Amino acid sequence: MIVDNAVIMAAGTSSRFAPLSYEKPKALIKVKEEVLIERQIKQLQASGIKEIYIVTGYMAEQFDYLKEKYGVCLIHNPFYLSRNNNSSIWVARNVIKNTYICSADNYFSINPFEKEVNDAYYAGVFTDGYTEEWCMQEDADGNIISVHVGGEKSWYMLGHTFWSERFSNKFLRILERQYDFPETADKLWEQIFIEHLDVLKMKIKKYAPSDIYEFDTLDELREFDASYKSNSRSLILKNVANRLQVFEADIMEIKTIKGNDTAAIGFEFSALGNRYSYYYESKEIMSMK
């Protein structure tokens, strides 16, 4: 089937990617000198997918330049703080047909997109060792028949998905029925998919581990792009390093601090064997000894 378009989800706050995601959306961070979402847009366009929608939410205005630069369309998700990513699917529902559903913060070392696709699929990477990711099992026809968190010697969910129009119609009908249920708000769209594997048929599209990357934290990004060790591109971390008289590379093991409303209010970090906390509003650095 011919791919109609692509929807790139870029609405979330990515609070685990502290403090860089406090300063700008994670999708707009450069990896190996290329803006994450721009790389993905260019890969889609190179594959013949010209109709591209970006679902925005957090710091939405920072994505505006993409309209003129790449001719993409922006769809705003006003529910990005109160709901999980099922709300991004919901606000884009009118354009989802034979559609790539992508996450803005994935880095593809190869171009995984094609203009013609045979079946609905979820990209997967194989692991021999144990992982906390969502592990998939398939039947003899290659259809996903179960998904569970954590496993070994398994294909796990990582990267983009392709929805056939048939899959899209079925999923969107289910989402419409369940959208206003209180328990739906916190669900990933993947959880809704998993709850209906009997009617939502999707295969595993298998990739090598070196094909798809996802960076949940600055420490993970530094493993892939070593330039971030000496230059974090973060004014906050530069200020912290200056005040503590350490190098940026000495600041590591960063963990987000959340307030009562689950919004990020700061982060913990280690530097030269000591543990500290930093709070965005007060700019205070506190020793955690």
Protein language model annotation of sequence segments:
Residues 34-54, 91:
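A short, N-terminal amphipathic alpha-helix
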Residues 64-135, 140:
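Conserved beta-loop-beta/alpha segment of the NTase-like Rossmann-fold superfamily
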Residues 143-212, 219-239:
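Catalytic-core segments of class I nucleotidyltransferases/pyrophosphorylases
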Residues 58-61:
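A conserved acidic beta->alpha catalytic loop
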Residues 1-22, 71, 271:
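N-terminal nucleotide-binding beta1-loop-alpha1 segment
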Residues 229-260:
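Short Lys/Arg-enriched alpha/beta "domain-start" segment
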Residues 4, 50, 97:
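Short acidic/polar active-site loop segments enriched in Thr and Asp
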